[in-house]
Amino acid sequence: MAVPKRRMSRANTRSRRAQWKAEAPGLVTVSVAGQQRKVPRRLLKAARLGLVDLDKR
């Protein structure tokens, strides 16, 4: 594992950490029981099979 040679300043640490950002999941339109819904792509199969409750919103 890499060991830093010198201490990193607070400003450099925070600016480096600020590069990490959360992204919203890409939504895909799926029709369930005649209604169009937008779900994340990884839940597409579960939504079609009825394993996900889409009426919570």
UniProtKB/Swiss-Prot annotation:
Signal peptide extent: none
Keyword set, alphabetical order: Ribonucleoprotein, Ribosomal protein
Stretches for region Disordered: 1-20
One GO CC term on file: large ribosomal subunit
Gene that encodes the chain: rpmF
GO biological process: translation
Matching InterPro entries: Ribosomal_bL32, Ribosomal_zn-bd
Organism, scientific name: Mycolicibacterium smegmatis (strain ATCC 700084 / mc(2)155)
Bias-annotated ranges (Basic residues): 1-19
Pfam families: Ribosomal_L32p (PF01783)
Protein name per its UniProtKB record: Large ribosomal subunit protein bL32
